[in-house]
Amino acid sequence: MYALGDWRRTHYSSEVNSEMDGQEIIIMGWNHSIRKLGKLVFIILRDREGTIQIVAPKQKVSEETFATAKSLGKEDVMAIKGKVVANEKAPAGFEVIPIEIKILNKADTPLPLDPSEKVSADIDTRLDKRFLDLRRPKIQSLFKLRSEVLKSIRNTFHDNGFIDVDTPKLVASATEGGTELFPISYFDKEAFLGQSPQLYKQMMMAAGFDRVFEIGPIFRAEEHNTRRHLNEAISIDCEMSFADEKDAMEILEKVINNAFTDIYNNNQKELQTLGIDLKVQETPFPRIEYTEAVDMVNAKGVEMEWGEDFSRPAEAALGEMMDGFYFITDWPTEIRPFYTLPNEDNPKLCKAFDLMYKDLEISSGAQRNHKYDLLVEGIKRMGLNPEGFGTYLEAFKYGMPPHSGWGVGIERLMMIMACQQNIRECVLFPRDRQRLTP
């Protein structure tokens, strides 16, 4: 008992089928469920790829194997060497008759959470016992989709000439001058966890890297306690030289469209497990100007002044009128970050955009201000001290090209794709205002 020995898995559950009739296999996983019917034991073994039925008839297996089968408890870890037997009456058209069963570890009882989902639990209980919650097939399917989405996004970036970079997550000042920072002890200096790779992405444009992307953690000390906010998230960021905001939106559309297309083509099993009928939206996505969006919100009976950001009621009103992905463009300069480039013909508006999905903000982006003097003016206009951005500003003195970019939170993207109402469902171990463990 408990020793793997020289056994190694030959197949995942999904790889076994009735055409393997008579073949000997080794499968490994957890005891998802068990039924003991006198001289017959039915075991459902669960692994990463699904479940498989093992049938142990007393008259066809050794006495030791039958006794081991009967002794299995729920969520015990096991390895089974057995023979595939085609059986039209079996749910999958076959079953596995065990030759030998190894119990690799026993699970304590009672279980604090039921991975078979026969007993429901609220989200706080599930997150407290997340290691058990993550065994649930639906949850595993969601994170398989997440992995494939990130793979698709990386492929799209590489196919379009972007270089993968990693920027510091320990920083000396705020990216956008805000107070939403987590301070940390950094020897004898003041430091913070990075809230965005924005300034470093722009410095890479000055370095001549032309097109870069990064997928990494961001930290924001926002006191939101909603189903849409996290204090630690994974951000997908890109920056591109010699490009305006329209070029940035085009790349963003391509990234989103390719991810949805790849998932639709390659991950129907996971989509079916989650009960999702995935739709791939055609590009280009609709575009509406900020001023038009404000008028639409007011027409819905939600009061909003020009120059304000969209409140939750305003976003909800837009979501009732707009279906799927769409861009909001031409924002007021005063409410966008200091590095956003104003329009030449109307400086009150800037070359910024948000990507929305119904009422949910997915991404913010813009063409950036690449002129040193104008950037310093923008910093001062926001009530910030340019001296706090010395290293960043220096990069603009020696030939910074025009550039644009954006950032997307993978968790919000997965909320859309996996039809989740709570962003915590899309994170292995979420960090929010109340939760620092597990």
UniProtKB/Swiss-Prot annotation:
Binding site for Mg(2+) 2: 361, 364
InterPro entries: Aa-tRNA-synt_II, aa-tRNA-synth_II, aa-tRNA-synth_II/BPL/LPL, Asp-tRNA_synthase_2, Asp/Asn-tRNA-synth_IIb, NA-bd_OB-fold, NA-bd_OB_tRNA
Stretches the record annotates as Aspartate: 198-201
GO cellular component labels: aminoacyl-tRNA synthetase multienzyme complex; cytosol
Binding site for ATP: 220-222, 228-230, 361, 409-412
GO MF terms held by the record: aspartate-tRNA ligase activity; aspartate-tRNA(Asn) ligase activity; ATP binding; magnesium ion binding; RNA binding
Names of the cofactor(s): Mg(2+)
Reaction(s) this enzyme catalyzes, per UniProt: tRNA(Asx) + L-aspartate + ATP = L-aspartyl-tRNA(Asx) + AMP + diphosphate
One Pfam family hit: tRNA-synt_2
Site residues (Important for tRNA non-discrimination), renumbered to this chain: 91
Membrane spanning stretches: none
Keyword Ribonucleoprotein assigned: no
Entry binding sites for Mg(2+) 3: 361
Assembly description: Homodimer.
Functional summary from the UniProt entry: Aspartyl-tRNA synthetase with relaxed tRNA specificity since it is able to aspartylate not only its cognate tRNA(Asp) but also tRNA(Asn). Reaction proceeds in two steps: L-aspartate is first activated by ATP to form Asp-AMP and then transferred to the acceptor end of tRNA(Asp/Asn).
Name of the molecule in the record: Aspartate--tRNA(Asp/Asn) ligase
Organism the protein comes from: Methanococcus aeolicus (strain ATCC BAA-1280 / DSM 17508 / OCM 812 / Nankai-3)
Gene: aspS
